[in-house]
Amino acid sequence: MRQPSVLGIVSFKVFPAQMGGQKGVANFYSHLAKKAKLVLAVEKENISTANDYTVLPFLYHHKRGFANLRYIFRLRKLIKQQAIDVICIEHSYMGWLGILLRWLSKKPFIIHSHNIEAHRFRDMHKPLWRVYQWYEGWVHGKADHSFFISQEDLDWAITHYRLSRERCTVITYGADLLHPLDKKERVTSREQLIIENKLDPATRLFLFNGTLDYLPNTDALRIIINELLLRLQAKQFLFRIFICGNRITDQWQKVLRSYPDIIFKGFVDDISLYFKGADCFINPVTLGSGIKTKLIDALAYDQTCISARSGAKGIPQEITGEKLVLVDDYDWQGFADNMFTQSDRTLQSVPAAFYQFFNWDQIVQKALSVIAVMKSRN
């Protein structure tokens, strides 16, 4: 039987993949390309080095989405030339394009959602977020199938957007690592961080990272400074909080660098050093939907993680063992207490069930099963 042929449409910058959301899209398609013929039509600013599938950077960013109408017949021609079976559109922004392409090509389309976008707009206080919520529900209802990043998002969309459960599937973010790290590697990385930053070996090392102009992460910076620092300092122990990430304002850089207990690193080429070397990853995030990719990455590195309950949506606690500690939203005293106690404990490694659940090959196989059914019906 011929492999399914998929056209992915990505209306934002993904390549080179640096941030969690970008890595999620790039890794999904790189694993999909092992089992399917893949062509990506992407936004013009993308620079891809992929050599196992075709990447065509000619689309406008979704902020100028309707300008892509000029490429509608180019896309139809591409679908015909490449014998495309299924169209996969990243995020709901360009879902309307999927409707047009289905009408022109008779090919079904999937919306690959990475969060409930209307919730993100609401949290950002966008004045038209309710308009987008109406559009998001409408376009998911028109799609032949919808992939959601978490069970929570899927259940919410089924209830509020009145979608058919049979046309919805959880396709989550995956981890690159397949098993816990060797303990010696963690010790070596910790020693490196201590030496490079001229710290006392007894210093407990915490880590927070992310795209720092993204509202949930910016709010987490505020929480670290206004809610956690004083509570930690009151416990009178040596600690430092590493903050890594890109797209941060000059004002925020100045603020972070004014606190001696915070070590602001900005964007780092090798975030794995910090995942391996820190004693504890913190996720004081309460805003946003979707899934916190940094939390999955940290757990994959066998890192002890403390998270606000809302920030851990999409990660079943039963597969994380002792390594994921959940604190009720806005209980910052409880959060600081756990930072003090958990960072000094020796815990069992992340269970094998975690690596199975967040294994990219298994995630993509689930998506392929849906694509195969859609292909057979077309």
Model-found features: residue ranges?
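Active-site proximal beta-strand in glycosyltransferases
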Residues: 7, 102-121
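Carbohydrate-associated surface elements
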Residues: 152, 171-174
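Short hydrophobic beta-strand element within catalytic cores of glycosyltransferases
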Residues: 294-297, 304-309
